Regions:
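Acidic, surface-exposed loops and disordered segments
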Residues: 1-176
Length: 176
């Protein structure tokens, strides 16, 4: 696909997935796209845990977001570690956001659907529980889990506002 076709095709898929495995090569390509994202001061604070099958995902189901993860044949958990960021403002939010968007676009390009799951993991107890299951060191923080797979149901898209409702030229409110 052309880049803008991928951007326009990406959406947040919140339904069930087909029970079709995601090949390792595709998971690796999606993860590489995330790791190639812009990151502040080259801190490279993002760490990914690839959950390559349902067996790897299963221990997370009782923690949070069961309805979004249960049918996913694969997922990627996005963590950040800011322990090496000492003398400058912490940009881990920007770093993991850029990595996550790159992975969503890469998944779309390969024909998969996904959704950015973060809300359920804002709860510190849930975050620590996921980290414990995945054996993640305490200096890392769970930011997002991306379930990945082929959609089993028709896509449901929310309409986007018109371009000129969200864009101004030179000064706020001015249009071309």
């Amino acid at each position: 696909m052309e880049f803008m076709d991928v951007v326009e095709a990406r959406y947040s898929y919140k339904q069930k997935f087909l029970d079709t495995p995601v090949p390792w090569e595709h998971l690796e390509e999606i993860a590489k796209a995330g790791l190639m994202a812009a990151n502040a001061m080259n801190a490279q604070c993002v760490h990914l845990v690839i959950l390559e099958n349902k067996k790897a995902i299963e221990p997370l189901l009782d923690i949070a977001a069961r309805d979004r993860l249960e049918s996913a044949p694969a997922a990627i958990a996005v963590f950040t570690d800011n322990s090496n960021q000492q003398d400058f403002k912490n940009f881990e939010m920007e770093d993991y956001s850029a990595a996550t968007e790159n992975m969503l676009l890469a998944a779309t390009n390969l024909g998969y659907a996904s959704v950015w799951l973060d809300g359920p993991y804002f709860d510190e107890k849930a975050e620590r529980a996921v980290s414990k299951v995945l054996k993640v060191p305490e200096t890392f923080h769970l930011r997002v889990i991306l379930p990945i797979g082929h959609p089993a149901e028709e896509e449901i898209r929310r309409p986007k506002k018109a371009f000129w409702e969200r864009v101004s030229v030179n000064v706020f409110g001015e249009k071309k």
